[in-house]
Amino acid sequence: MPSGPVPAGTFGVGAAVTKPACAEPPSNYPPLKVPGTVVKDIDGLEAGTNHGTAADKYVYPASVVNQWLEKPATQPKNKKIAFVTFDDGPTTKFTGEQLDNLKKAGARATFFMIPPQMRDVNKNMLSRSLKMGNALAIHSYSHDYKYLYHGSAVDKAKHIGCDWDWAMAQSRAILGSNYFSSAFRHPGGHMSWTNLSQADAALAKRGVGWIDWNAMSGDADAQRPTTVPGYLQMVKKSIKESNNPNVVVILNHDTYGKQMTAEAMPSILAWLKSQGYEFGVIA
């Protein structure tokens, strides 16, 4: 996986934004319209990345973070890093509230977006996020479990690869032709599905690695917390159950109905800082 900005001409960086060759994955949004030309980068985007220059000091490739999760013995010994992540956005209300929380705490996060939803938010909010030092990664174009995971290993590889291509086209149509992310979070998490080795290889050919999590606020659980302190306790509990690692990747959501996640985030960020964690983002 790339360890720095991807050069123009690699993985489509800097090229005209066109529709992928494969059929468009299922989506609740109207069909994607692409300009067929090079798209100017949104203000704040560092070319060849999913973040701005403010994040250069604390950005890590998805492949590195994933190795830390799968092999805790490889984690840094001399520092603690918290990767706060948000799935299923962006949304004007809840992404905006989380940006306010991050700014007040002096923290940063990685937003795993469903790219068609970027059509619903003002570009200024996305630009603000980049300038604050956050990363804008990919959480799939379709978020359709049946499309992504049904069938054989070959089917899964075909569909996940195609989904990524459409997600990238949509992202570049809004963020600019120089956008690139090496980070993909599977809907439901990679850990939840089987026979994905060929899909992993399909992503790797595109310069992409997957990333799950080892801690959570519980905001998507069927029996989710019902109070702000409960969300913080869930984060503490899940970190403890992961044997208090030096690297934590915390699952949250910034989609509709996640008001309590937004209300709980200041206390979560403050607690992480009190435990000596610095904040990183995932490229």
Enumerate the predicted regions with their spans.
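N-terminal pre-catalytic segment of deacetylase/amide-hydrolase enzymes
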Residues: 1-84, 91-97, 227-228, 233, ...
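Active-site beta->alpha N-cap acidic-glycine motif
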Residues: 38-153, 170-182
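Catalytic domains of cell-wall/extracellular-matrix polysaccharide-remodeling enzymes
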Residues: 119-124, 143-251, 255-273, 277-278, ...
